[in-house]
Amino acid sequence: MALSRIYSSKLASANKNLLPVITTYVRNASDSTDLKAVLSEKIPKEQERVKNFRKQFGATKVGEVTVDMMYGGMRGIKGLVCETSVLDPDEGIRFRGLSIPECQKVLPKAPGGAEPLPEGLFWLLITGDVPTKAQVDALSREWANRAALPSHVVTMLNNMPTTLHPMSQLSCAVTALNHESKYAKAYSEGVHKSKYWEYVYEDSMDLIAKLPVVAATIYRNTYRDGKGIGAIDPKKDWSANFTKMLGYEDEQFTELMRLYLTIHSDHEGGNVSAHTVHLVGSALSDPYLSFAAGMNGLAGPLHGLANQEVLVWLQKLRKELGDNASEDKVKDFIWKTLKSGQVVPGYGHAVLRKTDPRYTCQREFALKHLPNDPLFQLVSNIYKVVPPILTELGKVKNPWPNVDAHSGVLLQYYGLKEMNYYTVLFGVSRALGVLASLVWDRALGLPIERPKSMSTDGLMKAVGAAK
């Protein structure tokens, strides 16, 4: 049974002694390797649960809205239902109640690997259950079988100018895949709304399977003179096929990609990309159009470009101070940055009030695999220096690093240095969360999104302010 945000929030904020209960709950999984069949069993139960919940508590208030919230990007307004993840200010993201360290512990791994397979994370997000290794292997095979691109999309990708931004190429290709939408076809033929989720599921599975092929083709065309990506290997997992198609054979890099694609997959429903997919999907647009819209949001500098900005800033710092810079020199550079009116990129978060656990797990990966890398050592020095400085300033609610403070450094180390491409990796990962949510949107019959807007004059009148 899926956890609603309301119940997930209560669990996530409860006493830590309850965590074994959460783990026991989500591990109560079906043995079936047929994901659609597992969902078919869960969905009617969740529909009934939500129906009864709304019947009993539908008129209950869950929050208030202030004028500042309306002018401030709706930050803090409780206005969405998201089943897949909850962001706790102190503990970070929880995927269906599980923290990142818990996911690293319980989700299946590749043979000889230490990082969770993204297939397992997707199974968890869409079902609420921790999958078995057999279920994850079956999902890997299914995505491999669904991965082939239609010829018109291949032709489109191969004829795009290499100067076109990789995110623009991704958006175009995903939109063109709409030609194959099973949901759009079923809708045009009058399928009953109770069946919408089944076709959204089929499209979502197809899209997730094809995204690494699209993304790898974009990379090879743009940065590797159009060298072919090769064929999908049905014996390899989703991440391993992706890294192979990108042209990388290093098993450590494949492990990094498994970690990267897992931890970037979902972050509640209110961020730009997730909310956009939900919003466009609420108009009953198919998953291809909805996801393409979300990717256009992810391409925005305030959402998907943060790790690039961190790298640019780090390279500037390294150029000015050199390698092995002392903590005092780093401190001076930080103060110089802040006094010039700039921020320290990669630090702070809209919701989090502690170090982002997505940063922590990447730091642990670096300590294990690249402890002597100069750029990583610089990041480590900054981690020691920045939080006390930001705390001293007293103007920052969260002086701790977020996920973007680290991810670019790891990609650079393994040779993926093309920063304009990083958002495409983010997009491939984010598909896991937003498309799992989209399936549940249709399963629960959520309506078209249509909040009420007000003018400034209307707001002033409503609160009794003089115009």
UniProtKB/Swiss-Prot annotation:
<dbReference type="GO" id="GO:0005975">
    <property type="term" value="P:carbohydrate metabolic process"/>
</dbReference>
<comment type="subunit">
    <text>Homodimer.</text>
</comment>
<keyword id="KW-0816">Tricarboxylic acid cycle</keyword>
<keyword id="KW-0496">Mitochondrion</keyword>
<dbReference type="GO" id="GO:0005759">
    <property type="term" value="C:mitochondrial matrix"/>
</dbReference>
<feature type="active site">
    <location>
        <position position="404"/>
    </location>
</feature>
<feature type="active site">
    <location>
        <position position="349"/>
    </location>
</feature>
<dbReference type="InterPro" id="IPR002020">
    <property type="entry name" value="Citrate_synthase"/>
</dbReference>
<keyword id="KW-0809">Transit peptide</keyword>
<dbReference type="InterPro" id="IPR036969">
    <property type="entry name" value="Citrate_synthase_sf"/>
</dbReference>
<dbReference type="InterPro" id="IPR010109">
    <property type="entry name" value="Citrate_synthase_euk"/>
</dbReference>
<dbReference type="Pfam" id="PF00285">
    <property type="entry name" value="Citrate_synt"/>
</dbReference>
<dbReference type="InterPro" id="IPR016142">
    <property type="entry name" value="Citrate_synth-like_lrg_a-sub"/>
</dbReference>
<keyword id="KW-0808">Transferase</keyword>
<protein>
    <recommendedName>
        <fullName>Probable citrate synthase 2, mitochondrial</fullName>
        <ecNumber>2.3.3.16</ecNumber>
    </recommendedName>
</protein>
<dbReference type="InterPro" id="IPR016143">
    <property type="entry name" value="Citrate_synth-like_sm_a-sub"/>
</dbReference>
<dbReference type="GO" id="GO:0006101">
    <property type="term" value="P:citrate metabolic process"/>
</dbReference>
<comment type="similarity">
    <text>Belongs to the citrate synthase family.</text>
</comment>
<dbReference type="GO" id="GO:0006099">
    <property type="term" value="P:tricarboxylic acid cycle"/>
</dbReference>
<dbReference type="GO" id="GO:0004108">
    <property type="term" value="F:citrate (Si)-synthase activity"/>
</dbReference>
<feature type="active site">
    <location>
        <position position="303"/>
    </location>
</feature>
<comment type="pathway">
    <text>Carbohydrate metabolism; tricarboxylic acid cycle; isocitrate from oxaloacetate: step 1/2.</text>
</comment>
<dbReference type="InterPro" id="IPR019810">
    <property type="entry name" value="Citrate_synthase_AS"/>
</dbReference>
